[in-house]
Amino acid sequence: MSWGTELWDQFDNLEKHTQWGIDILEKYIKFVKERTEIELSYAKQLRNLSKKYQPKKNSKEEEEYKYTSCKAFISNLNEMNDYAGQHEVISENMASQIIVDLARYVQELKQERKSNFHDGRKAQQHIETCWKQLESSKRRFERDCKEADRAQQYFEKMDADINVTKADVEKARQQAQIRHQMAEDSKADYSSILQKFNHEQHEYYHTHIPNIFQKIQEMEERRIVRMGESMKTYAEVDRQVIPIIGKCLDGIVKAAESIDQKNDSQLVIEAYKSGFEPPGDIEFEDYTQPMKRTVSDNSLSNSRGEGKPDLKFGGKSKGKLWPFIKKNKLMSLLTSPHQPPPPPPASASPSAVPNGPQSPKQQKEPLSHRFNEFMTSKPKIHCFRSLKRGLSLKLGATPEDFSNLPPEQRRKKLQQKVDELNKEIQKEMDQRDAITKMKDVYLKNPQMGDPASLDHKLAEVSQNIEKLRVETQKFEAWLAEVEGRLPARSEQARRQSGLYDSQNPPTVNNCAQDRESPDGSYTEEQSQESEMKVLATDFDDEFDDEEPLPAIGTCKALYTFEGQNEGTISVVEGETLYVIEEDKGDGWTRIRRNEDEEGYVPTSYVEVCLDKNAKDS
């Protein structure tokens, strides 16, 4: 089966077919190229996906990824990154082993095809030229024969005519002979050209064309084989990465099998364990008995002297409920009056209604009375320190000793801080050793440097080490203090704590026992000696650095108000004061007389003029 013998007359169709074969090969190259682009795009998307879900450094997410399930997820992301790398390998191998190779082969194929069809067209043109020569000699031979016949007939006619001279007859005879000779020459030439054409035609159809078509056939078959080999390479490139992709998938399975739910549960305990003991039983409060209270100075003095107030606010049973009390609620209990404001006096006389028909002095809420008694004892200092620490936490300030955290979390933070400081100390010590060695080298070889130039740096490093050690001792002391307070402390510590509780009146040590402030922050627990040594000035100093609330306007007292309840302030008719808090709907306005004296007055007793800028802000 040969194109040279079977398709000897299909030159044009073979030319079209071979061009179609090259187009198919180029189309396959384009297909592989688009596949490589898809692989690269897919790999890029996988990498971006893996990067997107990676935990951010120095963020809360990084702390959350300590759980085994999250670690498995990280392993999944890493394996996905490697998986994406294999798709990049597929793209690279296809580009180098298929696209580049086939593109070069297509150029060679086009050149070979062009050469073969050029030879075919050249042979075709040659046979066409021979055919034209044959046709030309044939027409000339035919013309000469006709001319010879006419000359012979003319001679015979002249020879038969008796009226024609002998000279004319001779001339006609010579002309006939010339034409006859020309016909013979044309015949010989035609015969020669015909033989030559037949030979060329035989060579063309039986030698040249078969050889050229055979080359074209071989070229086309090589193209087909090359395309098949490229398809095999295409599959092999994919097959080569399958084992590595399998390892990636095995890694994902292994990471999934490493998930330990029990370990994660333990980590949750370590992350959120507060170290507090569950609250005790709430004592029964009998409201059937009349509550005898007095707010006179004598009763308050007696309460402080005896250390036995009527009610135990913040005792052990209620102290455990501190974590569930909102800070703003506590502040309102401490500062805002708990009675509705009195109506304005019926007459313009300031003495007409001194305190109003519903003055807070006449009736008190039990909770307000408890706070009144609570505020007259020294433990208020610690409670307000706890409150201040909670407020500072809400404002974003974190105490250095992490006292805003529950005991267990505070212990972990302190331990972490101690470890960090120890690492810094070790780093500074290594630096000091390096400087010392360099100084020794300078001492032995003065030409290398001046030893005295390192003294300043050595002193600076030593000073840093000393500072870090002092800092470490401070945090270690806090850590030891916290570890001594955790529920798992020794029996001796428990006995000492019980002795301490029994030696202090309930009202005095209530706030000291409660280690959690109203916002859930952890506060310091003072010993008995420090409790007895605290002076009233300590409480004032504790809040000296608190900035007063800014004034939002002014007010003028319309009537005289004698504020005799906690949180209120006395005003005189016509007095001008600063407004620091508007009426929140309870009928009271918070005002300030100077930097140290402020409180609430009934809104109906004053004429308020708010500053426009402050109101807008």
Swiss-Prot record:
Cite the effect that the entry attributes to residue 7 to E. Impairs membrane tubulation but does not affect lipid-binding
Start and end residues of each stretch annotated as Interaction with PDE6G: 495-617
Note down the stretches annotated as region Interaction with DNM2 and WASL.
553-609
A GO molecular function term, named singly, is:
identical protein binding
Q: Where is this region: Interaction with ARHGAP17, DAAM1, DIAPH1 and DIAPH2?
A: 550-617
Q: Which residues carry this modification: N6-acetyllysine?
A: 66, 110
Noted disease association is:
A chromosomal aberration involving FNBP1 is found in acute leukemias. Translocation t(9;11)(q34;q23) with KMT2A/MLL1. The relatively low incidence of the KMT2A/MLL1-FNBP1 fusion protein in acute leukemia may reflect the marginal capacity of this fusion protein to induce cellular transformation.
Q: What is known of its domains?
A: The F-BAR domain binds the phospholipid membrane with its concave surface. The end-to-end polymerization of dimers of these domains provides a curved surface that fits best membranes with around 600 A diameter, and may drive tubulation.
Protein name (record): Formin-binding protein 1
Source species of the chain? Homo sapiens
> Gene of origin?
FNBP1
